[in-house]
Regions:
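Leucine-rich solenoid repeat scaffolds
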Residues: 171-183
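Ankyrin repeat domain, specifically the short helix-to-loop turn at the C-terminus of the second helix
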Residues: 6-14, 56-64, 128-137, 162-170
Length: 183
């Protein structure tokens, strides 16, 4: 797959092209993970797969390692108050960063962990790569108010949680649904 990626990039593929919508043939995985990939780039998808080799290849061709997915229209949750005190994210605004993808966005829902393919034991190495080598913002909050610790905690990943706490991420940050990682 890396050879195919390199060939496409060498032939002029736009390394920072964004998906304009979720792809119909990925709906099974999207439905279980609850992650809309509209706005995702190849780099974001490599981060989501914990694939450092693919991330390095994309970076060598000019990939932007900080480009998040984009917020799309969601369910009307007007009846549910937002206790987070976060500013609203407009449609088309930033949704899920590559760091949040690599920390496990979507894994706290249903049986998602059984459906997603990623590099075995790649969680902490991918998170460290994004933070230490690429300067990913460990304090980034997604459009739902979650940070990387929320996603790592949803998977029960103590190593990533401790790493992020060591980088200063606050475990008491509240999502738009009122959830913290210490509840």
């Amino acid at each position: 797959y890396l050879d195919v990626m390199a060939a496409m990039l060498n032939a002029g593929a736009d390394v920072n092209a964004r998906l304009t919508k979720s792809l119909w043939y990925t709906t099974y995985n999207r439905d279980l993970l609850g992650v809309d990939r509209a706005g995702a780039t190849a780099f974001w998808r490599a981060a989501y797969a914990l694939d450092i080799d693919a991330m390095r290849l994309l970076l060598a061709h000019g990939a932007d390692p900080h480009r998040p997915t984009l917020k799309v229209p969601g369910r009307n949750r007007a009846a549910n108050p937002d206790p987070s005190d976060l500013a609203p994210v407009p449609l088309g605004g930033p949704a899920v960063s590559p760091l949040l993808a690599a920390s496990g966005v979507g894994y706290g829902q249903g049986d998602a962990g059984n459906s997603h393919r990623h590099v075995p034991d790649g969680w902490l190495p991918a998170v460290r790569f994004l933070v230490e080598e690429l300067g990913a913002d460990v304090h980034f909050r997604d459009h739902n108010g979650y940070n990387a610790i929320h996603h790592a905690a949803a998977r029960g990943d103590d190593a990533v949680i401790l790493y992020l706490v060591g980088r200063g991420v606050d475990v008491t940050q509240m999502s738009r649904r009122g959830q913290t990682t210490v509840d």
